[in-house]
Amino acid sequence: MKLSRNTVRVLAVTLIAGSSLFITSCGKTKTTEATNAAAATTAAPIIKETEAPTEPVAEITGAPGSEKETEAAASSGKLKTSIQKYEVNSISVEYPVVSGMENTSQQDKLNEHLKENALSILKNYPDSKEPMDESQDTLEVKCTVISADSGRVTVTYEGYYNMKGAAHPNNLFYTNTVDVKTLKDLSLKDAADPYTMAAYALSEEVAFVTADPEAAKAVAEGLKAVQKDMTVEQYQECLEKADFPLKKGSDGKTVTWPASFSYESEGTLYYSVPVPHALGDYIIIEYDITTK
């Protein structure tokens, strides 16, 4: 069954929330008050890793292409997948587990790699200098397997993060595409040219995905107010740093969480763009790489 969504075409200049947002989205700064509160000592947490429920959670909207997950499992040549969950206090992160590979050693390495990337948000969001406090912060991340076969595994993650003492939670979206044989993380640069994607995002042909028509109108109207603050070069830089593996920041030491993530599904490239919290924190642009 196809995912219900509206593809809304708007002027490219309405898609970016300004250079100030662009910069802060790469590493949100925690307040001193909140950081001090998070430093309070607590008892050692109990970590649980369980099989996640198979029923989807209503408040988390599946990424485009996720409707093919069940079909993929039944198709010839596809790998079997299940979802497990890491839980500690108010932290909950789902991650995929692959089964059915003939090479069980490679399967174990693949599963460890997928899990490591899924949970890396705990230590690297917004960056490795200010990791999440698993004893006091709240995080919920749902995992969707877009596709899984002998060539690659593609997964999306959606949810929210609420730091203790913060004014509001942040909506999250990240992805991971892994080459099954090499365990290499594939990024936007492996599917398309970042400059071309930046120019597309600033063109009149750009399209983004939303499940709510009213939300689409709000996004388009809200972004018009900050259209003048973004350039192709700034957006290109964002896309060049998109996806796993995680990169070090300007200091050469701190690992910084990407401002953009991407994945490909049936000839369409999807990539996220940071926007103001009032507009949802991110939007997803779609680009048909088979016809352009």
Residue ranges, per PLM feature:
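Hydrophobic/aromatic pocket-lining and membrane-interface residues
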Residues: 1, 50
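Bacterial N-terminal signal peptides that target proteins for export
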Residues: 2-11
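Repetitive helical segments and hydrophobic/amphipathic motifs
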Residues: 14-18
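Compositionally biased intrinsically disordered regions enriched in Thr/Gly
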Residues: 27-45, 52-292
